[in-house]
């Protein structure tokens, strides 16, 4: 099994599909990008960069110029400064205790919704 491509989260940004991996080995999560979606071809993800989160990534969302990355014990918000390094802009980090958070989505530019696998729903004002 190729653990380097165990995708846990995907998000769409400006015509490109991005994927974040779960980190089984080591501490780094890989960010991959698929620039071209061609139904007649074999599309390949390209490694964009690696980042060390505090835990395994479970979900992500991109909206309002912000990237939300959810792990089992925290939420990371990256403000998109339009540089090549998606994780290089202003960062906000929120720690919490939950059983098994598995999804995140922006409700508006200042609020996200986080959902646990058990169905519990949380709203977080950024």
Question: Model-found features: residue ranges?
Answer:
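Sequence/structural signature of beta-propeller domains
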Residues: 1-126
């Amino acid at each position: 099994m190729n653990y380097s491509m165990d995708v846990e989260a995907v998000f769409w940004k400006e015509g490109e599909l991005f994927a974040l991996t779960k980190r089984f080995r080591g501490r780094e999560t890989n960010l991959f990008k698929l620039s071209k979606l061609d139904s007649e071809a074999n599309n390949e993800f390209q490694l964009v960069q690696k980042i060390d989160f505090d835990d395994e990534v479970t979900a992500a969302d991109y909206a309002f110029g912000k990237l939300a990355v959810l792990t089992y014990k925290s939420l990371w918000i990256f403000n998109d400064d339009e540089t090549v390094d998606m994780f290089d802009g202003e960062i906000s980090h929120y720690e919490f205790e939950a059983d098994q958070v598995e999804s995140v989505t922006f409700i508006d530019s200042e609020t996200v919704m986080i959902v646990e696998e058990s169905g519990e729903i949380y709203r977080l004002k950024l």
